[in-house]
Amino acid sequence: MLRLLAFLFVVFFFAESAFAQLERERVEEDRDVELTFMAPRNINLYTVHHLSGGELHYSIMHTFGEVTGGARNLWGIDQGANVRFSFEYGITDHFSIVTGRSSMDKVIDLGTRFSLLRQTVSGSMPVSVSVVPLVGVNSSSLDFLDEPYSFNERLNYSVSLPIARKFSDNLSLQISPIAAHFNRVGPEINIANSTKNSYITAAFSGRYKVTQITALSWQYIPSFDNEVNNPSNLAFGIDIETGGHVFQMFFTTSQALHEPYLAASDNGRFLDREFRFGFNINRLFGIR
């Protein structure tokens, strides 16, 4: 009888251990995929790279003038600058608040970012999905606008839906449908069509990791505006990760730096050398 009890105890013990191991493996396999992108921005576009609760992302985004300015203007470095400063703070692991300011049209914006779905290692969820609604106000002076703009007329809105998949340790691809609206437009606003208020596009972007700290990146934002002969936005760059910093250097055909203006921007033609140099500096802080 004692031998039987001992045998049953051993069987139960090993069965329990095996079951626990299977549970641990199941949890491990179903964990979220990490580092789909190196930063919350890939060149100009928001990505599905979400902040953890208590994490702060600070970025400086900068584009210069077109390289067609030649050596006299240091291939655009001396002219046509657009600068954007932005902060994003993770309230939870799935929700963050965003604010920023762009020198183009002196737009101050406020928004949120929700992580709706997360790609899992097991494949039970094949993609990551976020949604980013933004509202901005043109704070330009009356001298710049030439005529009075009410507060409501100065507002612009956008919503983007980044959908991304990390196909391997090296390759990540993303599509971002974007809808944008400007309450009032005119020749004084830095967009391609001074008579059109609403815009819809679908931006494509991706990254390919070359080494542990570098990756190649790209974006393509087609122009669906048939009223003006506006080329699509095209950009290529390189990302360099150094601890808590991610440096991004790129060439782009657009001067715009955030979603509503990216959807409506006046773009150059890459093959005609109508592109410009730009860079982003991304810094992550844990402040909780």
Where on the chain are the PLM-derived regions?
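Regulatory/sensor and coupling segments of signal-transduction and defense proteins
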Residues: 1
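Sec-dependent N-terminal signal peptides
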Residues: 4-13
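Short hydrophobic "helix-edge" motifs at membrane interfaces and signal-peptide entry regions
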Residues: 4-5, 82, 202
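Sec/Tat signal peptide C-region and signal peptidase I cleavage site
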Residues: 14-20
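Transmembrane beta-barrel domains of Gram-negative outer membranes and organellar outer membranes
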Residues: 21-148, 155-159, 164-183, 199, ...
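Flexible, glycine/proline-enriched loop segments at strand-loop-helix junctions
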Residues: 146-151, 190-193
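A mid-sequence, solvent-exposed acidic-amphipathic segment
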Residues: 175-222
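Substrate-binding/catalytic groove segments of enzymes
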Residues: 210-217, 226-228, 245-248
